[in-house]
Amino acid sequence: MNKVHMMTAGALALGLLAGCNQGNTLSVTGGEPVSYQCEQGKKVQVRYFSLSDESLSFIKLSLPDGKDYTLPQAVSASGARYTDEHEAVWWNKGDEGFVELRDQDGEWQTAYNDCKQQ
């Protein structure tokens, strides 16, 4: 009897695993570079991405100093906000945005301001 229960449990587990594999395959969409001209002639580049089911949006932020950040979209009252909550934030609304970075004391400081889409 114990052997029958084991075989039934094994068959059930295989059925569940097979069912998990038949879900929709996700892909990443977007990625075209968008350039922004900021104060003092600095340029930042943002690539906007999302999963094909739109469950996640994120960006690749490239700064003039050569640093790159991959930032998921976060809750925002107005416009869009992308942040890792540790080092960088990209805020944008319409054709404009700005970048905040943490300083040595852990405080957010605006690093690139008044950035306008080119």
Predicted regions span which residues?
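Broad, structure-driven detector of short, well-ordered beta-strand segments within folded domains
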Residues: V44-S50, E87-K93
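Tryptophan-anchored aromatic micro-motifs
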Residues: G30-V44, Y82
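Mature extracytoplasmic domains of secretory-pathway proteins
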Residues: Q45-R81
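Bacterial N-terminal signal peptides that target proteins for export
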Residues: M1-A9
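C-terminal motif of bacterial Sec signal peptides marking the signal peptidase cleavage site
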Residues: L16-G19
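C-terminal partner/receptor-binding element of secreted or periplasmic proteins
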Residues: K93-Q118
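Short polybasic amphipathic segments
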Residues: V34, L56-L61, A80, E96-Q104
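Bacterial signal peptide processing site
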Residues: N21-G23
